[in-house]
Amino acid sequence: MRIPRRQSEADVYHVLARGTGRQLIFEDDADRREFLSIMEDSLVRTAAELYAWCLMGNHFHLLIHAPLERISECMRLLCGGYARYFNEKYGRVGHLFQERFKSEPVEDDGYLLTVIRYIHLNPSEAAIADFNEYAWSSYGEYLGSPRYCSIDDVEGLFAGPQDYRAFHEGYARTDECLEVGRLRNATRS
């Protein structure tokens, strides 16, 4: 029996989806570009706003603003569309993603900022690349021209780009989000 997802009063959710058995879901940059294209289309079709994103090898993180039912539809379009692309490209069949996506409500500005930083620092934490040099996250969108994210609401929480940089660089490993300690409390269905 599926446990109902927790609702967010603010309609903001940290969303995570991982490859089945932690398998890679991005084999190359072409896969990442296709994922972002499908993501952009899914966001437009469901009128969902994206605040942050990061693509890792075997999973991805999104921070989305929309009612939960629209997020579920967005993720259905995104994960289903990308799985069809991936399976066709690599001649495979079956599920690409492990279970349904995970989601966690984000209720206040403090936790919103924590989740954004957590998402952007994922490549550094995994020792893949420095977060400020990693091409497959929204970190740079807050320092330059936005491409996928609606940054106005979040940008207003910082005095400017220098403040935003300092917020990320002043990080100490105390943030707990969906994937870390809070996962036990997050709905897994």
Name each region found by the language model.
Residues 1-52, 56, 65-189:
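Short Pro-Cys-Gly-centered "Cys-loop" motif that presents a nucleophilic cysteine in a tight turn
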